[in-house]
UniProtKB/Swiss-Prot annotation:
Zn(2+) binds at residues 552, 556, 653, 657. The gene is alaS. PANTHER family: ALANINE--TRNA LIGASE, CYTOPLASMIC (PTHR11777:SF9), ALANYL-TRNA SYNTHETASE (PTHR11777). It comes from the Bacteria. This is Alanine--tRNA ligase. The keyword Iron does not apply. The lineage of its organism: Bacteria, Pseudomonadati, Campylobacterota, Epsilonproteobacteria, Campylobacterales. Its cofactor is Zn(2+).
Length: 845
């Protein structure tokens, strides 16, 4: 049974509109991730947004609980129900139906669609909710209805705001399977399992605790798909269900060990975490050092470490993405589009962590052996985090298995010190002034002012309001004062969608910039003469707008070219459009090759040469997406959107553009670079800026020719390269003749010495020179000690040698049997380290 589909179809038959799952990154600054089905509707429940039409909706919402207040990470894998990623089925009424219908719908779905046995079902209500208690008796015996207090059966969004009693449906898994002291209705055992929570939002709680009945009470319900699937399939753990076992079986194949529930926590951790990682990456969250990206990194690294426990010591998580897409790609089609991109990002991150995990685990185990109390050193935990990439909760996870904890206070202190150093030069951004500005009163008085600049670069407009530099309302801006002007209608485009704000003249005053604040289009001016509320001013947008719109249209063509050349996984991660340049950030796991860049550039220029008129359509959002228009993932759009078609490009966009592609003239890529893990950047120019750049290039080429006295630059460059190569060979030969102290021990060449050059290159050189050789070199640069060891065709293991000697100079490190490196702090101990290396080698040989 496809429970997800059955649920949505059932509520659709009851008049509910099916809403697509909102992004995992919510439009809510108070939340790290979308962690419940009601999150996308929060502003409707609070009354900040008008109730929709129809006012009853249903959804299957993807959720993440792995950070912040709602964090299930530590429990995942060790319990039957906890997950970092899950799907929440829900039906919602915004002032339409209430308890009677909510209870009736729930009972009908559970008993007639899911066909769960009625004799296995129990219900709870709030102890004071007589209405719900009476309503339930129409469907279930009174002795199966339990009344509990606020702790169990009252829900609130916060200390203030909408709240109300709730009613929960429970499923009895049987006393033959669960018989602990807590296995009773209301206990903490697993016998009676909550499957559905119906929240009756009927009060508004004020700061003093007073609860006032809402004029239009609402319904918010939630049922976990993973939990109800397990029940329907008669499984006692979510992980035994068809949602997880295919993934667990894949893990078993990778580690070549059979899965057993009692000892299988690592399998469950991996099967859960790969779902979170896949969805977050597919939705545009990337691995990072902070914020959501760091939570993503923590989840993956925790899974990699559990793979390590299973004996998997190479990248493997990326191999599980195919199975996630197979299981969930039909409902979440973007998983199919982003599959290869997600796999590449995961593999790169796995390789990055696996490169340090051995050294990190060695440090962890060394400190563990020294730990005499039940508390692990916070300093070492911080070093594991800072040097080896071990998130604190990963270290805590490993300690929990040993019955220990970590000194989090010391870890936090060191982390705060590091953050303080990083932010020492930060001076603020003025956002506080914007937050406290008089925008709300302007919105209440005038509403949002109209932009009329798609077709007009000039207008005669009325000054509705003026704000000073602190965003406070004033009646007048005097000569020399900087402030903001709100016009009744404005031809100035406010910075949005990556396009910079317009400049120009506003009467006799220069418009320095235009931005949108809380829906208000405001132009920043430096007053030349007095400007007052009620003035009628002649507005004229700078001709820079013509170049801006050319670069904006070129940006759309660039995205179409990227998707054509690199693949459908390309998604915008940021952009900047100005009069003389454009910048476009996009999701891609590796650098774009020269050949690919050439294809991208050619694609754009061919579209420009062909020419095509801009086509603008106003469509409802669903039809726009169905038509193939590209939308920013996670962006909130109005019900009606502006769809722009420019030749091969079709996007949702409210910016200004050319009327025909041939207005762009030409397009030239200036550079390609990396921004962060999985995000690349292309900077480019078009139109006049491209012409100016071509002139600069021509001048540079002519200057090179002049310096070469007319010779062919390419031939001259080849000649210079040949000379450089010859000199490098001479230098290499010279370095070979400068013998280090080479000894012979039982037929093995042994080199133990100080060395100030490139240690790795010298070790490679000596390994190439001798058939059997052991090398140990030590050098100092910028006060830091560098150690390196190499071994070829001997019994000496370079990694073991380095690991033994490094502590002498106050360092640590390791590596392979044939090559290893380490760092240290105490250069005064180099001679002692060299003696120790000589002794180690002599004893082994």
């Amino acid at each position: 049974m496809d429970i997800r589909k059955e649920y949505l179809d059932f509520f659709k038959s009851k008049g509910h509109e099916i809403i697509t799952s909102a992004p995992l990154v919510p439009d809510d600054a108070t939340l790290l991730f979308t962690n419940a089905g009601m999150v996308p509707f929060k502003s409707i429940f609070t009354g900040d947004v008008p109730r929709p039409n129809p006012p009853i909706r249903t959804s299957c919402q993807t959720c993440i609980r792995a950070g912040g207040k709602h964090n299930d990470l530590d429990n995942v894998g060790y319990t039957a129900r906890h997950h970092t990623f899950f799907e929440m089925l829900g039906n919602f009424s915004f002032g339409e139906y209430f308890k009677k219908d909510a209870i009736s719908y729930a009972w009908e779905f559970v008993t007639e669609v899911l066909k769960l046995p009625k004799d296995k079902l129990y219900v709870t209500v709030h102890e004071k909710d007589d209405e719900a208690y009476e309503l339930w008796q129409k469907f279930i015996q009174k002795d199966r209805i339990y009344r509990f207090g606020d702790k169990d059966n009252f829900w609130a969004m916060g200390d203030t705001g909408p709240c109300g009693p709730c009613s929960e449906i429970f499923y009895d898994q049987g006393s033959e399977h669960f018989n602990s002291d807590e296995d009773y209705m209301g206990g903490d055992g697993d016998r009676f399992l909550e499957i559905w929570n119906l929240v009756f939002m009927q009060f508004e709680r004020s700061k003093d605790g007073t609860m006032t009945p809402l004029p239009k009470p609402s319904i918010d319900t939630g049922m976990g798909l993973e939990r109800v699937t397990a029940i329907k399939e008669d499984k006692f753990s979510n992980y035994d269900s068809s949602l997880f076992m295919p993934l667990i079986n894949e893990v078993a194949k990778l580690c070549h060990k059979q899965y057993e529930y009692k000892t299988g926590a690592s399998y469950r951790v991996i099967s859960d975490h790969i779902r979170s990682v896949t969805f977050l990456l597919a939705q545009g969250v990337n691995f990072d050092k902070e914020g959501r990206g760091y939570v993503l990194r923590r989840i993956l690294r925790r899974a990699v470490r559990h793979g390590y426990l299973l004996g998997i010591k190479e990248p493997f998580m990326y191999k599980l993405v195919d199975k996630v897409v197979e299981l969930m790609g039909e409902h979440y089609s973007y998983l199919k589009e982003k599959k290869e991109y997600v796999k590449e990002l995961i593999k790169l991150e796995e390789e990055r962590f696996l490169a340090t995990i051995v050294a990190g685990l060695d440090l962890f185990n060394e400190e563990l052996a020294k730990t005499s109390s039940n508390v692990f050193s916070g300093e070492v935990a911080f070093k594991l985090y800072d040097t080896y990439g071990f998130p604190l909760d990963l270290t805590a996870d490993m300690l929990r298995e040993k019955g220990l904890s970590v000194d989090e206070a010391k870890f936090d202190a060191l982390m705060n010190e590091q953050k303080a150093r990083a932010k020492a030069s930060w001076k603020g951004s003025g956002d506080a002034a914007k937050e406290s500005g008089d925008f709300k009163t302007l919105l209440e008085e005038f509403g949002e002012n109209k932009f009329i600049g798609y077709d007009n670069l000039k207008s005669s407009s009325k000054v509705l309001a003026l704000l000073n530099s602190e965003f406070k309302r004033v009646n007048e801006l005097k000569n020399g004062e900087i402030g903001y002007v709100m016009l009744d209608s404005t031809p100035f485009y406010a910075q949005s969608g990556g396009q910079c704000g317009d400049t120009g003249m506003l009467g006799e005053n220069q418009a320095l910039d235009t931005k949108k604040y809380f829906g208000l289009n405001l132009s920043m001016i430096e007053a030349k003469n007095s400007i007052k509320i009620g003035d009628i001013v002649l507005c004229e947008v700078s001709l820079n707008r013509l170049e801006i719109r050319r670069h904006h249209s070129a940006t759309h063509l660039l995205q179409a070219a990227l998707r054509n050349v690199l693949g459908a996984h390309i998604a915008q991660a940021g952009s900047s459009v100005e009069a003389d340049k454009l910048r476009f950030d996009f999701s891609h796991p590796k650098p774009v090759t020269k050949e690919e860049l050439e294809k991208i550039e050619n694609f754009v220029n061919e579209a420009i040469l062909k020419g095509a008129p801009a086509k603008i359509e106003i469509m409802d959002i669903q039809n726009a997406k169905k038509s193939g228009a590209i939308a920013l993932f996670g962006e909130k759009y109005a019900d009606k959107v502006r769809v722009l078609t420019l030749g091969p490009s079709k996007e949702l966009c409210g910016g200004t553009h050319v009327e025909n592609l041939n207005e762009i003239g030409s397009f030239f890529i200036v550079r390609e670079s990396g921004v962060s893990a999985g995000v690349r950047r292309i900077e480019a120019v078009c139109s006049k800026a491209a012409l100016e750049l071509s002139k600069e290039f021509r001048k540079e080429i002519n200057d090179i020719k002049d310096s070469l006295k007319g010779a062919d630059p390419l031939l001259s460059i080849k000649k210079l390269k040949d000379e450089i190569k010859s000199l490098q060979n001479d230098l290499k030969n010279a370095s070979n003749t400068k013998d280090l102290d080479v000894k012979d021990i039982n037929g093995v060449k042994v080199v133990v010495s100080k060395f100030d050059g490139d240690i790795k290159s010298k070790i490679d050189e000596l390994k190439n020179k001798f058939d059997k050789v052991v090398v140990f070199l030590a050098g100092v640069k910028d006060g830091k000690v560098s150690l390196g060891s190499g071994s070829k065709n001997t019994s000496i293991k370079a990694g073991e040698l380095v690991k033994t000697v490094a502590p002498i100079v106050g360092g640590g490190g390791g590596g392979r049997d044939d090559f290893a490196t380490a760092g240290g702090k105490d250069e005064s101990k180099i001679d002692e380290a060299l003696n120790a290396a000589t002794k180690f080698i002599s004893e082994k040989l």
